[in-house]
């Protein structure tokens, strides 16, 4: 997943 990705995080900002």
Curated annotation (Swiss-Prot):
Domain of life, per lineage: Eukaryota
Molecular-function GO terms, alphabetical: hormone activity
Keywords: D-amino acid, Hormone, Secreted
GO cellular-component term (any): extracellular region
Modifications made to the protein after synthesis: Ocp-4 has D-Ser instead of L-Ser.
UniProt subcellular location: Secreted
D-serine (Ser), modified sites: 2
Keyword Secreted assigned: yes
Function (record text): Cardioactive; has both positive chronotropic and inotropic effects on the heart. Ocp-4 is a 1000 time less active than Ocp-3.
Protein name (record): Cardioactive peptide Ocp-3/Ocp-4
Originating species: Callistoctopus minor (Octopus)
């Amino acid at each position: 997943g990705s995080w900002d």
